[in-house]
Amino acid sequence: MSLQRRVAVGTVALACLAALRPPSLSAQAAVLLAGVTLVGMPHGAFDHLVAARVLRPWLGTGWWAPFLAGYVALAGLVWIGWILVPALTLMGFLTLSVLHFGLGDADGDRVGIAGVIARGAMPILLSVALHPAAVAPVFAALASSHVAVVLPMLIGARWLILPWGLLIVVWTGAATAWERAEAAVTCAAFALLPPLLAFALYFCVCHSLRHLLRLGAMLDPYDARAAWFGVLRTAGPATLLCAVCATGLAVQGVETAIVPVFRVLAALTLPHMAVTLWLEDRAEPVPKGRPQLRTAPSRLA
């Protein structure tokens, strides 16, 4: 069992106690903003390192120019979508999120498409199906629509729980015990907690932390301590930049930061997913899960 899964299972299970006294929307937004700042956004700070490992042998020292241009172009395309076709952009964002979460969290190379969709749809579908009234205002704001239009659509999407449940059954047959435990506490969190808080927990503790540790192993697969230092050093500038932006949003009110945060995440999801799908597949393979020593037991175990 990896350290990351132990942390995820314990943290999310403990957080479910918040259901005894549900936090206010402001408190949920503060957790989301803090989590995205400290873990969520920084986990994409490694994209240029992954790109360098693949593109430098082809393009030499000038590899960064086409990478940066492509990254900004993809992010800009999504941002333009929020302006011109917000409803279509929201649907695209949700679809990409399912694929990205599923591929990153379900070890899709081992369990196949059922595992990818089962795990990837979990945070999206459970939010919509179990808490449509709470999700509708956020989706309406993102899509530049009205709650009265969005809410019936979300309620009508509840039927998707049935095919998703069948995929979960298929996936659990190939999953490890701790993968099933993580999925169970994640489902419990989305059932018991407000959807914004449940998503913040999933995105930061499950998805982003797993990605950070995997890329830490890419930096130094032989020395766990050096890998941790590399993670902090690489993610530090992005974390500071996010902290400045988060402070600016918080000054205006943490509740007003919810929609901008999701729009920025959507804009960065497309280029980040391109890196994780295309470039990581061509980079030197690294151990999944956490930094570890190849010649001795991991100090993170």
Predicted segment positions?
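Predominantly late transmembrane helices and immediately cytosolic-facing juxtamembrane segments
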Residues: 193, 202-219, 227-232
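Long hydrophobic alpha-helical segments that form multi-pass transmembrane helix bundles
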Residues: 113-173
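C-terminal ends of transmembrane helices
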Residues: 44-54, 98-110, 166-176, 211-220, ...
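Short, hydrophobic transmembrane alpha-helix segments
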Residues: 16-30, 250-253
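Membrane-interface helix-loop-helix junctions at boundaries between adjacent transmembrane segments
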Residues: 53-56, 60-62, 72-129, 136-137, ...
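N-terminal membrane topogenic signal
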Residues: 1-11, 63
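Hydrophobic, membrane-inserted alpha-helices
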Residues: 11-18, 69-79, 98-101, 164-168, ...
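Hydrophobic core segments of alpha-helical transmembrane domains in multi-pass membrane proteins
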Residues: 30-40, 86-99, 183-187, 198-210, ...
